[in-house]
């Protein structure tokens, strides 16, 4: 699979989750932050990243940089996906179903963020198992990466391109 160059794209980023950690030292607590970020161009390209730093803006910046290195292409069909798919990561499962035009994004939290930046406009989703944002984002990306366009499926099956 070809690597997608982020410099050629107009990417938007969305912060999914910010976590504050505390290291207890002799003088008190030292706080650090981690940010889970998704980026996408709104036309079928999406990626996620996890940045950690002492300050929130720096953690977000690091997350965006990492997300730009993990981009995947999603085959869209009329602002939806071509078929039902289940993505898995850890204990998290995400079910994605295509929806008719005008339905909108029926998804919660982390799944909604990933789908909106990727450019999916009409879709139904359900989180099964873990609701941890990290697991849900990775499971959603896994589900989207399992999708194939009609042309790719025909080529895999060796069928002629006639419908």
Curated annotation (Swiss-Prot):
Keyword Glycosyltransferase among record annotations: no
Description of its domains: The N-terminal domain interacts with the head of the 30S subunit; the C-terminal domain interacts with the body and contacts protein S4. The interaction surface between S4 and S5 is involved in control of translational fidelity.
Coiled coil: none
Gene3D superfamilies: 3.30.160.20, 3.30.230.10
Secretion signal span: none
Keywords, in A-Z order: Ribonucleoprotein, Ribosomal protein, RNA-binding, rRNA-binding
InterPro entries named among the record's database cross-references: Ribosomal_Su5_D2-typ_SF (IPR020568), Ribosomal_uS5 (IPR000851), Ribosomal_uS5_bac-type (IPR005712), Ribosomal_uS5_C (IPR005324), Ribosomal_uS5_N (IPR013810), Ribosomal_uS5_N_CS (IPR018192), Ribsml_uS5_D2-typ_fold_subgr (IPR014721)
Complexes and interactors: Part of the 30S ribosomal subunit. Contacts proteins S4 and S8.
Pfam families, A to Z: Ribosomal_S5, Ribosomal_S5_C
One Gene Ontology term from the biological process aspect of the record: translation
UniProt source species: Syntrophotalea carbinolica (strain DSM 2380 / NBRC 103641 / GraBd1)
GO molecular function, one term: structural constituent of ribosome
GO cellular component terms attached to this protein's record: small ribosomal subunit
Name of the protein: Small ribosomal subunit protein uS5
S5 DRBM domain segment(s): 11-74
Record function comment: With S4 and S12 plays an important role in translational accuracy. Located at the back of the 30S subunit body where it stabilizes the conformation of the head with respect to the body.
